Design a protein with these regions (language model features):
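Alpha-helical adaptor scaffolds
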Residues: 33-42, 46, 64, 68-76, ...
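Alpha-solenoid helical repeat scaffolds
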Residues: 51-54, 88, 125, 159
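Long, contiguous interaction/recruitment modules in multidomain scaffold/adaptor proteins
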Residues: 1-51
Length: 185
């Protein structure tokens, strides 16, 4: 009896219980996360959803949408390892999925590892070459190029964005400032 009480207080029972609760709450948390009318999840709920999704994906590893969701949650929580791994799985399962590729590229470019940054930049270059009219891709590509001190590439991407954005778009002023800053480098 003493051993059981001691284990419940100091052992991994509490962690197992938290994992079981997260797994049980996953359907409700997922429904809330996907419902634009529902109250947004707080950080603790997002962490529980990530744990529950990770558990689900162990049994349903081919679920591209599940990996994408886990990648997004990893980005929101600032968990680079979770985000990068989840997006890598989504890309591996569906190499033509633009959301997976863009999420993976973003996770790689935000990494503290220079090799990840380089790989993210390469992936973004491929995405831009496939579709040079996607503002999200161009924006992330320009940011990545600027961070890696490839200023001519950043300017080219921002100039392409200016051609695509309407005259009154508020983003134009930010892009124009970014171009001037890159040209000064």
């Amino acid at each position: 009896v003493v051993a059981a009480i001691s284990y419940s207080q100091t052992g991994s029972y509490q962690q197992v219980r938290a994992w079981q609760q997260a797994t049980a709450q996953t359907p409700g948390l997922l429904a809330r996360a996907l419902d634009p009318q529902a109250q947004p999840l707080n950080e603790e709920e997002m962490a529980r959803l990530a744990l529950g999704l990770r558990t689900r994906l162990q049994n349903d590893a081919g679920n591209v949408e599940g990996w994408l969701m886990l990648g997004r949650i990893g980005m929101v929580l600032g968990n680079a390892g979770t985000a990068t791994g989840a997006y890598a799985n989504a890309c591996r399962l569906d190499p033509k999925n633009r959301d997976a590729a863009l999420g993976y590229a973003e996770a790689l470019t935000r990494s503290s590892d220079p090799e990840d940054n380089r790989r993210g930049g390469e992936l973004l270059r491929r995405l831009v070459s496939r579709d040079h009219t996607d503002i999200r891709v161009l924006s992330l590509y320009a940011f990545s190029a600027f961070e890696q001190q490839r200023f001519d590439e950043a300017v080219a991407a921002w100039e392409m964005m200016l051609k695509l954005l309407p005259a009154g778009d508020a983003r134009r002023a930010v892009i124009e400032r970014s171009i001037r800053l890159a040209q000064e480098k």
